[in-house]
Amino acid sequence: KLDSSRRTLLERINAMGIDAREDEVFSSAYATAAYLKDVLRFPTDRKAYVVGMNGLEDELDANGIQHIGGTDEQDCQGLDGLDFSPLASKDALDPSVAAVVCGIDTKFSYRKLAKAFRYITRPGAEGEVRAGEQNGGCHFVCTNEDVTFPSSEGLFPGAGAVWKGIQVSSGRDPIVVGKPHQPMIDTIFVRFAFDKSRTLMVGDRLDTDIAFGQRGGIDTLLVLTGISTLEHVHASDAAAVPTYVVNGLCDLNTALS
């Protein structure tokens, strides 16, 4: 949910007593970096402007994609009142940037919003991204569309809440890589040749997790410990209907034993 790197997620999984390898872990941050590199063929001499955190930056690094913004201290700071001069100066934007990549960002600032806006609305931004050029085309790619995520302290805004401000102000729709969208499905299916009939997608959201499994042609299991409830499942306008529903993962363990 927090666009963690595969390494960070692997540490959490291993700490739960589950034996797994890094190449078996797929996060929206990893899928986004892989999509930029392998599908969009992002030029190695261009940069991504990041609205996001360490996990997203780590995966961009692992895929050889240069980036700025993100955890940079200056970009995490707001402006001084209505003084827009720091964003309007000649050197405010890097002409080598050819993608705005957005995920969850707990240090999201007006400076980041404005820079992302200016990159994807500059002249020619919706055109082709080319190597060896300055300015021109600029992709708008987001990790996932979760507008909220559950934590031990309650419900908080997610990545979708961050990038929608950029979308609304710029008028540009992003490429959303994570669940339930096709880029994530393609990344997993290309990496592993597995039997869909023996696969189960487990998640806590109808609109992302369960819809993702259905689009991928696999059975789904909704866990009622997160966002979606039985009321959501039975609603006439349900985003998706799961194959199975359990109160918690302990119920799944009982069923499999």
Predicted regions mapped to residue ranges:
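Asp-based, Mg2+/Mn2+-dependent phosphohydrolase catalytic module
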Residues: 2-23, 33-257
